[in-house]
Regions:
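Auxiliary Fe-S-binding modules of radical SAM enzymes
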Residues: 1-67, 98-105, 132-143, 159, ...
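Local cysteine-cluster metal-coordination motifs and their immediate loop/turn environment
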Residues: 48-60, 71-86
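Active-site mouth loops of central-metabolism enzymes
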Residues: 70, 81-94, 147-156, 216-223, ...
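Conserved alpha-helical substructure of the radical SAM core
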Residues: 86-113
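Short, solvent-exposed loop/turn segments at secondary-structure boundaries
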Residues: 91-93, 123-128, 185-187, 223, ...
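Structural motif
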Residues: 103, 117, 149-151
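Conserved radical SAM core fold
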Residues: 113-123, 153-155, 170-192, 209-212, ...
């Protein structure tokens, strides 16, 4: 008796790399942490600290700081490394800018960081909401500085840049995230050169000293590719750089290919400084808004 072809065998499940000791963090508790959570819940606000499973969430919350996530908690992109939910987002909340400013005032923030999901469903990519948030913050906290971490605003990055730079945030950040070769797998829907062009546009409008970019390490890049990306970011005009370790949010995301040691991060930070970056944060737990300040 003949039988049909057998189904191909599945490749064995790849065991995740063991997490090294330097990535283990102590989880604090107490009133500062509870207070930030209450403020977020009361205003129906979100933080990227929660949505992206940031390893520094407890440290930052305990210090009374947070990075606000605007335009909802559902992203229209499907980056292979990101923990933020993907799907069809809710309509833009018109009360969000006012609630965010209120929470920032109650927290007594001196430097407010705002980021967002990608909103490819919106004509302006959400740029108008960034502008409204900054305007509300200026009214509520006139002496606070502001930092925006923005998406690539496809298909109209120039219009978005003009709008956001018109209200002059203190820091303009956009993340290249990874090396050119890994973009198709890690950042489908995004283009490496477009992200560099956005940094250049911001540097032309605000000055490179105000422009920041971040890379996550451990997605499968080579050291030569990594150094090339650092050079590309500098050539684009950014003068602030953050380098941090990729931590896979789940087994459905791109697995960690390599853990970089603190010594390796220090060497990469020194390389970036040798190129002329003015402010470099480089370490396993560093993230885009880690120790954010003007």
């Amino acid at each position: 008796m003949t039988t049909g072809p057998s189904a191909p065998e599945r490749p064995p499940r790849r065991e995740p790399l063991p997490r090294p000791d330097w990535l283990k963090v102590r989880i604090p508790t107490g009133e500062p942490l509870d207070r930030v959570n209450r403020l977020m819940d009361r205003g129906s606000l979100h933080t990227v600290c929660q949505e992206a499973h940031c390893p520094n969430i407890y440290e930052c919350y305990a210090m009374g700081t947070a990075t606000f996530l605007i335009l909802g908690e559902v992203c229209t992109r499907k980056c292979g490394f990101c923990a933020v939910a993907k799907g069809i987002p809710s309509p833009v909340d018109p009360d969000e800018p006012r609630e965010l400013a209120r929470a920032s005032r109650e927290m007594g923030l001196q430097h407010v960081v705002i980021t967002s999901v990608d909103r490819d469903d919106l004509e302006d990519g959400g740029a108008g909401q960034f502008v409204r948030v900054i305007e509300e913050l200026r009214a509520a906290l006139p002496f606070a500085t502001t930092e925006v971490l923005v998406p690539d605003f496809r298909p109209d990055p120039i219009g978005a840049l003009d709008a956001i730079c018109s209200v002059r945030p203190t820091i303009f950040a956009h993340n290249v995230e990874t090396v050119r070769r890994l973009y198709p797998a890690a950042r489908p829907g995004s283009v490496y050169e477009d992200s560099l062009a956005l940094l250049t546009g911001a540097a032309e409008r605000l000055g490179g000293d105000s422009v920041k970019c971040s890379l996550i390490l451990g997605l499968g890049e080579t050291e030569d590719e990594l150094r090339e990306a650092i050079r590309d970011i500098h050539a684009a005009g950014a003068r602030r750089l953050n380098l941090g370790q990729y931590l896979a949010p789940s087994d459905r995301h791109i697995p960690v290919k390599r853990y970089y040691s603190p010594v390796e991060f220090r060497a990469l930070g020194e390389y970036a400084e040798s190129l002329g970056f003015l402010k470099v944060e480089s370490g396993p737990l560093v993230r885009s808004s880690y120790h954010a300040k003007p």
